[in-house]
From Swiss-Prot:
Annotated protein name in UniProt: Protein MGF 505-11L
Natural source organism: African swine fever virus (isolate Warthog/Namibia/Wart80/1980)
Cross-referenced InterPro entries: MGF_505 (IPR004858)
Protein purpose: Plays a role in virus cell tropism, and may be required for efficient virus replication in macrophages.
Induction record: Expressed in the early phase of the viral replicative cycle.
Keywords, alphabetical: Early protein
Family of this protein: Belongs to the asfivirus MGF 505 family.
Length: 542
């Protein structure tokens, strides 16, 4: 007669014909519902060809809540960690006690604590695996584990302890890192954080790129200051987190110029579209955004988007011009030409002042040659930038440059200091290129630069007929504009070089000059001419 033990062993190989996997029948044949002893085996053979590991048998036995006596035997057939993990999964405190009784010196198994869903079992398990004898150390270990594996009830239960020992912030950091949304909300609202910063949750959300964490921060019953939300919006723009930005914008409804400016600078077209659809920003704000887009070398699509939102009559602010020049953004110039109030002249003037050769060269495609040279040379003179002046004059036709500078000098009548600089540049250019003296004499006489006029006359060939005719013309200019010194010098110079026959014509010219002075009512000039005629009349007598 077989003993029960032998009978059980025999039944290991006696399984139902239709059994294809580990079933209740097999467990019964194995004796898992029998209170007697079971002999340890490495594997269990089913249907003579299917082999089940001891782990599979233990896992199934726990799932079917098999006899504890049998399970106590089976846990010895597997590794302690696997047995503990299965006991936690199935919330079997009795099995845990059994395992811990077998393994009094267990290593740390914190990494499998999360396998249980039972708060009681979690705490019980931690009690065994935490080796510290210090109560505070064990409590902190438990709370850190509860935070790590998302057990809010344990934290709520020990709320006073968290406050007393000021460990709320470190636990909160773990919750944020692990993205336990409900736990994060609990930390913020439970009053356990000793130094809570409003930006902490937002910063963590951006750092982790966690949208759900941002939603928690937005939905918390906290009134955030505007500057914080604006700062977070700027961060969203920099990181190009469109969902984050949209959530902040729609939830807090905060609009500031710095926001659209940053979006333009970082070329965030999608964010710009969202902002511009609100119809909140005025033309000035959009112009500032355009300036920022130029600064950041934004795409053509972004620039066109901003330009299309502008009022066509809106005056372009200086910051737009300065941004083009400072950041050398040539590509945006054709796009800005769409704005009616955009002035190439202003751009060139500022470019010359900033000595930006690239921008000046780029403007050649959009301005007539005369206009460009007039602007460049004028600004070079005004800013006393002789290097730029020389750059734009050395390869050009000398007389063309002379004529251009002459026109510039005429435009600077009310700016005597700058006009004097222009005259000096003209004389220097005239000398370097060895141009005819006559045009220079006329310019100096017309603007009453007597000292430079005298020096030029001194250097001229006074016997040259062209020079003589030029001096006579200077007489007329002087009488017309009441330049007594110029008139007197021309008169004296001509008397020295004219023949007797020429003097007669010359005196006729002087009489005509007197008529001009009378027409303009220049009494000083009239008296001067009368005195000169009376004094030198003898020169035309036979």
């Amino acid at each position: 007669m077989f003993s029960l033990q032998k009978k059980a062993l025999q039944h290991i190989y006696m399984t139902p014909e239709n059994a294809s996997q580990l079933t209740k029948d097999l467990l019964q044949h194995l004796g898992l519902y029998w209170n007697g002893p079971i002999i340890k085996m490495d594997t269990v053979v089913h249907l003579h060809n299917k082999i089940f590991s001891n782990r599979s048998v233990l896992k199934y036995a726990l799932a079917k809540q098999a006899n504890i006596t049998i399970i106590k035997t089976l846990v010895l057939w597997v590794e302690p960690e696997y047995a503990l993990a299965q006991a936690l999964k199935h919330n079997r405190k009795d099995v845990l006690e059994c395992i811990f009784s077998y393994h009094l010196t267990t290593p740390k198994y914190h990494h499998i604590m999360h396998l249980t869903s039972s708060q009681e079992l979690f705490e019980f398990f931690h009690l065994f695996i935490c080796k510290s004898k210090n109560y505070n150390a064990r409590m902190e270990c438990l709370l850190y584990a509860a935070t790590l594996y998302n057990f809010p009830n344990i934290l709520e239960k020990n709320r006073e302890y968290i406050i007393r020992y000021s460990i709320g912030n470190s636990l909160f950091a773990i919750a944020c890192k692990e993205r336990h949304i409900h736990l994060i909300a609990w930390f913020v609202t439970a009053g356990v954080l000793d130094t809570y910063d409003d930006s902490m949750l937002f910063n963590t959300a951006f750092k982790l790129g966690d949208y759900s964490l941002l939603e928690v921060a937005c939905d918390l019953p906290i009134i955030y200051p505007d500057y914080l939300i604006i700062s977070m919006m700027q961060t969203a723009i920099q990181k190009n987190y469109f969902r984050f930005f949209k959530k902040l914008l729609t939830h807090f409804n905060i609009y500031r110029q710095i926001i659209i400016t940053d979006a333009a600078y970082y070329n965030r077209r999608k964010i710009l579209l969202l902002l511009l659809k609100q119809n909140i920003f005025n033309n000035f704000a959009i112009l500032c955004a355009l300036s920022a887009a130029i600064k950041g070398h934004a795409s053509k699509k972004t620039l066109n988007l901003l330009i299309s939102q502008l009022d066509s009559q809106m005056t372009v602010v200086d910051s737009v011009y300065y941004s083009i020049i400072k950041y050398n953004n040539i590509d945006c110039i054709p796009l800005l030409m769409q704005i009616k109030t955009f002035r190439m002249e202003t751009l060139v003037s500022i470019a010359v002042h900033g000595n930006n050769i690239n921008i000046i060269a780029a403007c050649k495609a959009f301005l007539p040659k005369d206009t460009l040279y007039h602007l460049v040379l004028k600004m070079a003179i005004v800013s006393r930038n002789y290097k730029l002046f020389k750059l734009y004059t050395e390869k050009e036709n000398p007389m063309y440059i002379f004529t251009t500078i002459k026109a510039i000098i005429s435009n600077l009548v009310n700016y005597t200091v700058v006009q004097a600089v222009a005259i000096e540049y003209l004389r220097k250019f005239h000398q370097e290129r060895q141009l005819p003296i006559v045009p220079l004499l006329m310019v100096l006489a017309e603007h009453n630069y007597i000292t430079k006029f005298k020096k030029t006359c001194y250097a001229a060939n006074m016997s040259d007929q062209k020079v003589k005719r030029a001096l006579i013309k200077c007489l007329f200019i002087a009488s017309q504009k009441n330049y007594c010194q110029i008139f007197k010098y021309c008169f004296g110079s001509l008397l020295k070089v004219l023949s007797k026959h020429e003097r007669v014509k010359f005196f006729n010219s002087v009489v005509f000059a007197k008529k001009l002075a009378s027409y303009y009512d220049h009494q000083n000039m009239i008296h001067l001419i009368d005195s000169l005629i009376e004094r030198f009349r003898y020169l035309i007598k036979d």
